[in-house]
Amino acid sequence: MNLSIIIPLLNEAESLPELHGWILSELNATNLTFEIIFIDDGSTDNSWEEIEKLHQSHSSTYGIRFSKNFGKSQALHAGFAQAIGDVVVTLDADLQDAPSEIPNLYKRIIAEDLDLISGWKKKRYDSLFFKNIPSKLFNWAARRSSGIYLHDFNCGIKAYKKEVIKSIEVFGEMHRYIPVLAAHAGFNKIGEQVVVHQARKFGVTKFGWIRFVNGFLDLITLSFLNKFGKRPMHFFGFWGSLMFFIGFSAALYLGIDKIYINIDGRLIAERPEFYIALTTMILGTLFFIAGFLGELWVGQQNHSQRYTIKRSLKSYE
């Protein structure tokens, strides 16, 4: 199969019929074989009923329904797990991403042998203060910290080679940083393409200042995880051992000072330096334990269930 279209959504029932028809009109005009996978991330409107109707009328359309809202990253993860196309394209369900971009993204990723292409909404139809300015600040910080020079990390429309999305773990709120995750997995051929951004036609935006703040926190988390996520003992163990050694050395010095030098001086327990040394040793021990627990968590995380699927219109493996 040439293409898998992955569409995560939350309360977008009004948009789905138009979006689905638009995708079909664009792709039926090509010779590409494709599938469309909607992931309902715990919608409370009629989104799932609309997906069931689309599935009944088009055999290449599928749906996955979460038992509750788990977040966009988990929705993408579920879609990626089911995708079988050589190229996987993601887009949002709010009609602000134009399906007319899909054929061009497919042609370019194949022709230029890219690992992924990220969309760039160069001209936006969003609030200047509440979305455009925060988005520019966020993307600037992401570029500086990751070394990947994309203009729009959070753009919903992206195209990936299948091996890319099968090789990375999208977790937490890391959907914004899939290009960074891909680069750290060795997929460095990253392209960017200006895409059309349209004004929202139905519903209301899910964006808010809290998501903007979370984006920066996730960036810090990602930076740490990329360095130490698979080996937390390297970070916590090093600093824990260093702090314990410093604290122990200080306590040893105080003991030698009392026994051989300041014999008539204050008791060790009366000196504040002793409690500083003791605290440093305790913190070092706690850091070391944190590293050990982190190693246990890393070993177990692949066996944990990250989301619950309530219904599926596609065999889930």
Where are the model-predicted features located?
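Cell-envelope/extracellular polymer assembly enzymes that use nucleotide-activated donors
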Residues: 2-4, 35
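Short beta-strand/loop segment that forms part of the nucleotide-sugar
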Residues: 20, 32-43, 64-65
